[in-house]
Amino acid sequence: MLAGPSGVGKVAIVARLLAALPDLELSISATTRQPRPREDEGRHYHFVGRGKFDEMAEAGGFLEWADIFGERYGTPREPIDRALAEGRDVLVEIDVQGARQVKAAEPEAYMVFITPPSLQELERRLRTRGSETDHQIRGRLAKASEELAAEPEFDVTVVNDDLETAAREVVEIVDRLRRRTINGGHSRVKERKH
């Protein structure tokens, strides 16, 4: 799992990770929010109505789901189960609340936390994105402060102070995890002790 506050650069890191490791399966989240400019159905999210989302949630169709800033987001269970059954590695890009739910349901899931170099830089990124009002940005920054406190819950942290460097570090983490799996548990990934 790749998690971190809104605006930290998760989407950009995921794009670079998938370019470097094209065999990695990306879990596409479902959401009730409207698409942002340059977001495509089925590529960035599955954009669904509230009724359809609620049906999926009630039927156990999500590995996790949450209300975030007045919209619902969820990780559909079936595509992940199918990919894992076929022996493929799955990447889930998610918020902190969702990562906690997934970890509770799937304790073997490996959690990478992406953090900004500072809250000031995070605010700059959110404003540059141009898709939220001032009120929404203030809400996202308040939530980010809470989420940053969750960093010790994650297996490893990557500071996104330079996108290319952060993306390269995440690629290296995935490579090490794959080697650990292949080599029977031997890894040089420095993990936090929980």
Task: List where the protein language model places each region.
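Walker A/P-loop
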Residues: 11
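The feature captures the helix immediately C-terminal to the Walker
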Residues: 14-15
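P-loop (Walker A) phosphate-binding loop of NTP-binding proteins
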Residues: 3-5
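Conserved phosphate-donor/acceptor-positioning beta-strand/loop module used by diverse small-molecule
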Residues: 90-95, 104-128
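NTP-dependent small-molecule kinase module
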Residues: 124, 128-132, 146-194
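ATP-dependent small-molecule kinase phosphotransfer cores
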Residues: 29-90, 97-100
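ATP-binding Walker
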Residues: 8
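Post-Walker A helix-loop "phosphate-sensing" segment adjacent to the P-loop in P-loop NTPases
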Residues: 18-27
